[in-house]
Amino acid sequence: MADHLMLAEGYSLVPRPPPAAPAHGPHALRTLQPYSSPGLDSGLRPRGAPLGPPPPPQGTVAYGAFGPSPTFQPFPAVPPPAAGNAHLQPVATLYPGRATMPPGAPGGPSGPQPAPGAPAPPLQPPAHALGGMDAELIDEEALTSLELELGLHRVRDLPELFLGQSEFDCFSDLGSAPPAGSVSC
């Protein structure tokens, strides 16, 4: 009935006479009461016995309807099946002149160590047997043509690509006039 009304919390529509005047018959005015009486829940419905089970006494742990779980573990004891099948691939180095060492080799990264008593992990297939795009070698000529096509060969000539645009916002910093049609600082 009053779904379309938006009332502030603590106000209610209750057919009550004003405190100083008696009710004027069945057409008593509906007034907004700023505070509800103790027996009403926000003035909208009478408060009776709470529904559902009684709350547990303080100091006890509530387990729900089925009681405590006898085999509760916060984390699964066995890893998911997909986690054991993943093979780690070496990532291409960021330094082109530096060769990568195989895992476990002196000077190279240490490989994953199996847990004591665990069976030895299966050997990884060679890179050429993967059949994926990650294993294909890219021709240097193809890289050079991409570099020229994308304009990456000019990176050394354009310091703003390294420093960011904010250092060259004003052309007065460069010591030359701005190009025609550009916005000045």
Curated annotation (Swiss-Prot):
UniProt biased composition (Pro residues): 103-125
UniProt keyword list: Activator, Cytoplasm, Nucleus, Transcription, Transcription regulation
Protein localization: Nucleus; Cytoplasm
Region (Disordered): 15-64, 95-130
GO cellular component: cytoplasm; nucleus
GO MF term list: transcription coactivator activity
InterPro entries to which the protein is assigned, alphabetical: CITED
A GO biological process held by the record: response to estrogen
Signal peptide feature range: none
General function of this protein: Acts as a transcriptional coactivator for TFAP2/AP-2. Enhances estrogen-dependent transactivation mediated by estrogen receptors. May function as an inhibitor of transactivation by HIF1A by disrupting HIF1A interaction with CREBBP. May be involved in regulation of gene expression during development and differentiation of blood cells, endothelial cells and mammary epithelial cells.
Quaternary structure (record): Interacts via its C-terminal region with the CH1 domain of CREBBP and EP300. Interacts with all TFAP2/AP-2 isoforms.
Family: Belongs to the CITED family.
Name of the protein this chain belongs to: Cbp/p300-interacting transactivator 4
Organism encoding this protein: Bos taurus
